[in-house]
Swiss-Prot record:
Protein name (record): Uncharacterized protein MJ1106
Family: To M.thermoautotrophicum MTH236.
Species assigned in the record: Methanocaldococcus jannaschii (strain ATCC 43067 / DSM 2661 / JAL-1 / JCM 10045 / NBRC 100440) (Methanococcus jannaschii)
Superkingdom to which the source organism belongs: Archaea
Amino acid sequence: MLKNLLYKIEKLRSGELEGFEVLKEHIQSLDEFQYQQIVERLKFQIELVEKYKPKVRPAIDPMVSTELGIYRRLDDFEIGKLLDYPECCIKSFVEDVRVAIDREHLKEVEEMKEELKNKGIYAIVLPSGFIPCSLKCEEAIKRGFIGYLTKEEFDKILELEKELKEKIRHWHFGYDEYYEKIILP
C-alpha cells in the first residue's frame, strides 16, 4: 500500500504519471532536500510497516503528508487518487464535506456491532485521516483502509503504532495517532 504511494510520488517527480496535474506541479516544485526527506521518511515507514504486515495500513507520516500538500487541500480528488482511496470514499469526503468519523458512521457501528462481536471482532480500525463513505465499504476493506480486527490483530496494530510514534518523530497538530480505533463495546 505505502510502496504504491512511493512509486506514484517518484513518477510524479519525474513527470511520468498522468492524471495528477496539481500534485505533479507541487511535487516537481519541491526542492531536492524536501523531496529526499519525503522519500527517505516514507521508505523508513514502509520498512517498519512491513515488519508487522497489518490488515490496515497506518496513516502516512504527518511530515510526508504535509510536504505532499495533503493538508493544503491542493486537490482533494487528486490526493484521494494518490493515496489509492476508493472513488466512492473520495466523493463522499468532497461532496458531503465529511471530515471525521460522524453520526452516520457511528450508526453503522451500532447496526454491525452484535454481528461483528459474534464473529470475534474486537475493533474497527482505519488509518487516521481516512474518512470512508461507509464503514461497510467493500472497496475500502479490500484495499486495507478499513479492518474488522480480532483482539490479537488489534494488539498488533497497537504495537506497530507505538513503534511508528517512537521512530518517526513529528510535530503535527492534526493527529498524534496513526490509526482511528473504534472498539466494539
